[in-house]
Amino acid sequence: MKVVIIDNYDSFTYNLAHLVKELGVDVTVYRNDQFQLRELEPFDKIILSPGPGIPSEAGLLMDVIRKYAGIKPMLGVCLGHQAIGEAFGAKLTNLKEVYHGVATPCTQFGIDRIFQGMEKRIEIGRYHSWVVDRTNFPECLDVTAVSDDGCIMGLKHKNYDIHGIQFHPESVLTPEGKTIVKNFLEL
């Protein structure tokens, strides 16, 4: 299997790549503005990395989702998760309280296979100031996990193999993070 990570200029991207390599999978990293969409054709799965800012400012990130939705499985992390939400019609909300390097519990609803084998309550590492808004949430997506403060921490597309997590699976603050990535790779 070959996986590509779209790097949204985030310091965590290579931690995520290292985690994928640890799981025995060939991984390539492309910066979000230094490739052409057709270069993703040889890859089996796409991971959309965390990053600063908002999805519309992240190079080809939104174009990747639009072109490969329904064609290639995707996992969006943090900014990548937000981009998935926006690509399918969700809006983002800027949080009043910023979460940077904060461990909090969240509840996953058992409806996404990336959480397979986990307890309903899991600890997650949060590094964000934006979230996908629950208001007017798109019909084509399911909320798969929420934080105790009601923020969407996970989503998936109802028809496509597309999953998003607001938190960082590669962080030591997310003890089940490696399992989440492994589950995505095995889908």
Predicted regions and their residues:
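Extreme N-terminal starter segment of soluble prokaryotic enzymes
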Residues: 1-4
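Active-site beta-alpha loop architecture of Rossmann-like, nucleotide-cofactor-dependent enzymes
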Residues: 12, 53-55, 172
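Two-component/phosphorelay signaling modules centered on CheY-like receiver
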Residues: 17-25
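A short beta-strand-loop structural module common to alpha/beta enzyme folds
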Residues: 26-34
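Short amphipathic alpha-helix with an adjacent loop that forms part of the alpha/beta core around
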Residues: 35-43
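Cysteine-nucleophile active-site neighborhood
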Residues: 43-117, 181-183
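Catalytic beta-strand/loop cores that center a nucleophilic Ser/Cys/Thr
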Residues: 112-159
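Acyltransferase
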Residues: 172-187
